[in-house]
Amino acid sequence: MAKSTREAYGEALAELGKINERIVVMDADLSGSTKTSTFKKAFPDRFYDFGIAEANMIDAAAGFAFSGYIPFASTFAIFGAGRAYEQIRNSVAYAKANVKLAFTHAGLSVGEDGGSHQALEDISLMRGIPGMTVFVPCDAEEAKKAVAAAVEIDGPVYLRLSRPNTDAVTDADTPFIPGKANVIRDGSDAAIFATGLMVTRAIKAAELLEA
């Protein structure tokens, strides 16, 4: 069944919150869209809404991390990576804070929200920060694994999540090894590399080439 990675993110947070009381979640007035509202309903005392104050949220997340918590800070990718980049670079990454950044509506896939909300630069901005682990899950199942992996990593992590529903590409048995790609299908004529939402498009492209 098709499901968005942002929806899977919210579900994974709520599930992990049951077994790890160190997890806290914060949002910048978009919990209904980022799906952190799922965690909010389950654990209202561990959820913090900062309003439209992304930079403050990131700095607070760093504070939570240095107090022993595992904070997940969420907003749209265009606002998180754009408006709060200095705080991410200095307060989180430079300080090696154990903060998890989960930004949704990433990439050229949110036409419904207008041209100003298309976050294209976020992945390069985050990959350019030393010490930042970047996960771009291709479907809901992989998104849940990415959230679980982020909890286990001691350091900053960026989860790049999408708005649209995506067909399932992986399943519970598909390996999730940070830093290692999965081979979706074998062939010898061409090699197609893809990440995130583009994996399903790459599969369709391969099918067209094969036809």
Give a label for each model feature.
Residues A191-A211:
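Glycine-rich phosphate/diphosphate-binding loop of Rossmann-like nucleotide-binding domains
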Residues R163-V183:
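Aromatic-enriched
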Residues K35, A168-V169, R201-I203:
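Short helix/loop capping segments that flank catalytic or ligand/cofactor-binding pockets
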Residues V24-D27, D189-A194:
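Short hydrophobic beta-strand segments
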Residues R46, T170-D173, K204-E207:
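Surface-exposed flexible segments
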Residues M1-R160, N165, P175:
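Thiamine diphosphate
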Residues A14-E15, A181-R185:
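Short boundary motifs at domain starts and secondary-structure transition points
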